[in-house]
């Protein structure tokens, strides 16, 4: 097979990802032997002029995770709003203390559980509700919730702390569900595009975390009032969400995007185990199932993505087990010095900025390096190896410690290095698996497969968030 451009590696409506027996054992040959995307007669494949589509998907990737990142990064604001001002000066209300100490864990559970339900609903809606409607509706809900959150910044909630906590959790539930529909719909749509566009979307998600971390540091440095800082913080997110809505509306006007967004006629679902005849891309002998006009077939998708799904789930399980519940409670060993770097800026810098920047670097690496391949046993091996990060983080200066009193790593360098390693491995390994998923199925199943891969992400986040609450209580 001749060497072709990246666009030529996209599927036709009846194509499937195939590898030879040798490439199954060769990690370096991650994406060889894909069938060509042959445009219909008389239809020329357009170019992505000025990388417009790439930039739009990158920006939408930022917007897909920006709400969650802004929520968890504004820790100082939440601690300020949720402090129990009614507690006696000489003591502390145990219930209020529980809200403060385990707020990140509660927030993580509130964000992941509704995501699971919304992903199932979104899968069922793939062929029933147009992706255009799902994206715009979910963006509208996200924008409305963020406007409510922004409006509450200047409201005095000291007399109804628990009520504000309940409102915050409800907002996170709705926000998480809408964000899930938005991100999974966009990701599923990129399954029909060349892989560089999927990579742009995924890298954009990491950039959203980096942007929120940088914005948090700037706000903390520029404003002494945590409420003014949070107001600027949330207003930034609100403005960017409006920008995302405008960029998505612009996407359909680009010739390059319209080419890959053209409707795909229902065709057979190729199992991936049969050999395609050399003289035909769609021989009737290999047709095994017809796609239902309403609900995509789930079984062949699960079968093809089982190994990649495990990798995605376990990567995000380990990540959400540690970040943010464990990371955000690791304090500087020199906190008593009174330095701003060891108090005010320590967590935003060593946890949020380093993790998100490393995550961005890991995701961006996949644009040039795609090793191990989708069928390699090394990929799940590297994924399982990340389990070692759990005890390493616990042995840092996590506070408060109730059961495990010993702090092994007596330097602030360790949490910084571990956060970077957590982010880099999360970005690279998860992006590889997410990129491979929609490319190993026929093009007409790409969007549905994207939703399924998003479900694996959410499953890992849900399991990790639930276990993080238990881990926090055990330390």
UniProtKB/Swiss-Prot annotation:
Coiled-coil annotated spans: none
GO terms of biological process kind: adenosine transport; cytidine transport; dopamine transport; guanine transmembrane transport; inosine transport; norepinephrine transport; nucleobase transport; nucleoside transmembrane transport
Listed GO MF terms: cytidine transmembrane transporter activity; guanine transmembrane transporter activity; monoamine transmembrane transporter activity; neurotransmitter transmembrane transporter activity; nucleobase transmembrane transporter activity; nucleoside transmembrane transporter activity; organic cation transmembrane transporter activity; uracil transmembrane transporter activity
Residue spans, topological domain Cytoplasmic: 1-53, 127-134, 184-199, 252-305, 359-377, 437-454
Low complexity composition bias: residue spans: 12-23
Reaction(s) the record says it catalyses: adenosine(in) = adenosine(out); guanosine(in) = guanosine(out); inosine(in) = inosine(out); uridine(out) = uridine(in)
Short name of one Pfam family: Nucleoside_tran
Keywords: Cell membrane, Disease variant, Endosome, Glycoprotein, Lysosome, Membrane, Mitochondrion, Phosphoprotein, Transmembrane, Transmembrane helix, Transport
Reported effect, residue 279 to A: Decreased adenosine transport at pH 5.5
pH-activity dependence text: Optimum pH is 5.5 for adenosine transport. No adenosine transport at pH 7.4.
Domain notes: Contains a N-terminal dileucine motif (DE)XXXL(LI) important for endosomal/lysosomal and mitochondrial subcellular localization.
Protein name: Equilibrative nucleoside transporter 3
Organism: Homo sapiens
């Amino acid at each position: 097979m001749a060497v072709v451009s990246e666009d030529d590696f996209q599927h036709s409506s009846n194509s499937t990802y195939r590898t030879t027996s040798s490439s199954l054992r060769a990690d370096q040959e991650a994406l060889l032997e894909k069938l060509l995307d042959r445009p219909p007669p008389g239809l020329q494949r357009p170019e992505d002029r000025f990388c417009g589509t790439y930039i739009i998907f990158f920006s939408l990737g930022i917007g897909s995770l920006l709400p969650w990142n802004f929520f968890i990064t504004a820790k100082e604001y939440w601690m300020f709003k949720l402090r129990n001002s009614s507690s006696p000066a000489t003591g502390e209300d145990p219930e209020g203390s529980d809200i403060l100490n385990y707020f990140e864990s509660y927030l993580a559970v509130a964000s992941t559980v509704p995501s699971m339900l919304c992903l199932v609903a979104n899968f069922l809606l793939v062929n029933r509700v147009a992706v255009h409607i799902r994206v715009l509706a979910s963006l509208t809900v996200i924008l409305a919730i963020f406007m409510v959150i922004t409006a509450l910044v200047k409201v005095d909630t000291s007399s109804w702390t628990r009520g504000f906590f309940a409102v915050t959790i409800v907002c996170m539930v709705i926000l998480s569900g809408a964000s899930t529909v938005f991100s999974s719909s966009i990701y599923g749509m990129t399954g029909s595009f060349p892989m560089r566009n999927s990579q742009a979307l995924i890298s954009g998600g990491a950039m959203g975390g980096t942007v929120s971390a940088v914005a948090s540091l700037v706000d903390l440095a520029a404003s002494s009032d945590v409420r003014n800082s949070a107001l600027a913080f949330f207003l930034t997110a609100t403005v960017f969400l409006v920008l995302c809505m405008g960029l998505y509306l612009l996407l359909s006007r680009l010739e390059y995007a319209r080419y890959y967004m053209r409707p795909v006629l229902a065709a057979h679902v190729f199992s991936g185990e049969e050999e395609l005849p050399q003289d035909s891309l769609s021989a009737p002998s290999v047709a095994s199932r017809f796609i239902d006009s309403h609900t995509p077939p789930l079984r062949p998708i699960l079968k093809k993505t089982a190994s990649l799904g495990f990798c995605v789930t376990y990567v995000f399980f380990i990540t959400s087990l540690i970040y943010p519940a464990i990371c955000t409670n690791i304090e500087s060993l020199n906190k008593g010095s009174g330095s701003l770097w060891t108090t005010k800026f320590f967590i935003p810098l060593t946890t949020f900025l380093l993790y998100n920047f490393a995550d961005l670097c890991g995701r961006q690496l996949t644009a040039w390096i795609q090793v191990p391949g989708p069928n390699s046993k090394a990929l799940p091996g590297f994924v399982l190896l990340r389990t070692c990060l759990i005890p390493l983080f616990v042995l840092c200066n996590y506070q408060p410690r109730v059961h495990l009193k010993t702090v092994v790593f007596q330097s602030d360098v360790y949490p910084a290095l571990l956060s970077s390693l957590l982010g880099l491995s999360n970005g690279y390994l998860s992006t590889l698996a997410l990129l491979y998923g929609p490319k190993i199925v026929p093009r007409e199943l790409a969007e549905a497969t994207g939703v399924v891969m998003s479900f694996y992400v959410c499953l890992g986040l849900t399991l990790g968030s639930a276990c993080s609450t238990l881990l926090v209580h055990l330390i």
